[in-house]
Design a protein with these regions (language model features):
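The canonical Cys-X-X-Cys-His
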Residues: 29-37, 92, 121, 128-135, ...
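Short microdomains enriched in Cys/His and/or Lys/Arg
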Residues: 51-63, 150-163
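Conserved small-residue-rich
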Residues: 118-159
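N-terminal targeting signals for Sec/Tat export/insertion, comprising classic cleavable signal peptides
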Residues: 26-51, 56-64
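Sec-dependent N-terminal signal peptides
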Residues: 4-13
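Electrostatic cytochrome c docking/interface patches
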Residues: 14-28, 41-46, 97-124, 144
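Short pre-active-site segment immediately N-terminal to redox-active cysteine/selenocysteine motifs
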Residues: 20, 27-30, 38, 54, ...
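Axial heme c-ligation environment in periplasmic c-type cytochrome domains
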Residues: 42-49, 65-99, 104-109, 142-147, ...
């Protein structure tokens, strides 16, 4: 029932007063240790950008860590996820979705370009990613689909490998085969194209 309520809140923004952004910001302090003061993350593979992430998607990922469907013991312990309430999770997710890095500081919104064959990457992206993450890589917030163009390539590389190793489920489908046949060179090409879609990187 609670997850249904969150879905309704995301679908109908006028009901958003049911989540407490101020509490979300307060609760997110433990997240800031790794993900930065504004949730901007770091360019490495371990601390992704949280700012601007759709709340529905973030709630699902937090729950996946709590239920050990995604594994990161250090993160779970540091952020005390097992002791946090569902209300606090909703507030944190809503807070991070509300953070606009471009308005706070455009420098924080920059995504480093990834070297690779962007032509090949575009071909792969349009074949496997565009329908969900949109042509511009900005995702679909109302449907809980994150923006790939606003995430660090090294983190995305690691997550694609996790999908390939069956350490993480893609698109809520354990049978999903989107990444099964991608070589590392294909992944690098895909990320080269995705990073080219980021603000400030578009030619």
């Amino acid at each position: 029932m609670k997850r249904l309520l969150l879905t309704l809140l995301l679908t109908f923004p006028l009901a958003a007063q049911a989540v407490d952004l101020e509490n979300g910001q307060k609760q997110a302090r433990s997240c800031a240790l790794c993900h930065g003061h504004y949730g901007q993350g770091t360019p490495g593979p371990a601390s992704p950008r949280l700012a601007g992430t759709p709340a529905g998607y973030m709630v699902k990922q937090i729950e996946a860590y709590i239920n050990e469907e995604r594994i990161n013991p250090r993160m779970v312990i540091t952020s005390s996820l097992h002791s946090i309430s569902e209300e606090a999770i909703d507030d944190i997710a809503a807070y991070y979705e509300s953070v606009n890095l471009e308005k706070i500081n455009p420098v924080l919104n920059r995504i480093p370009e990834w070297p690779g064959d962007t032509a090949r990457g575009k071909e792969l992206y349009e074949g496997d990613c565009k329908s969900c993450h949109r042509k511009n890589g900005m995702g679909k917030s109302r449907k809980g689909i994150p923006a790939l163009a606003l995430q660090y390539p090294r983190y995305l590389f690691r997550q694609i490998k996790m999908f390939q190793w069956d350490k993480r489920v893609h698109d809520d489908d354990p049978e999903d085969e989107t990444f099964d046949e991608l070589t590392d060179q294909d992944i690098e090409a895909l990320l080269a194209y995705v990073s080219s879609l980021a603000p400030g990187n578009k030619k």
